[in-house]
């Protein structure tokens, strides 16, 4: 697990002479990075919202490719956090077997955009491995395992995770839950 914190002088506003507020991370953002990923907001363990990763379509090598939209991500993060003390939990990812160089570069770019937006907004971020958050959440392995676990935990929001392609949403929720533990 890797954690990057904002320097305390920037993170803790002064309340009075020599007193600093103690951050209370009741708002946790879970991030499944990549163009097919998602962002979830939990407040005191309650799922408040989940959003597909903002993307933009660009032309690369004469074909259309989706990639994370920096401006869209910044606007979304701002709308989720506002002035509240928040922490972010992002999946720590590495190269996957059989993944091409171009694909790895694109994915790394997405993670860099996420890290940059969080740093600019002074939101501390912790990176957790997939194995770590899956174990903490009790989800079975695989895309359907995450979706099933989230639907068990949040049955009233099950419609948000009904499609197979909603696995990124489910992962983001479980990542946030793992970070709130």
Q: What is each of the regions a protein language model found here?
A:
Residues 1-181:
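Phosphate- and other anionic-substrate recognition elements at nucleic-acid/protein interfaces
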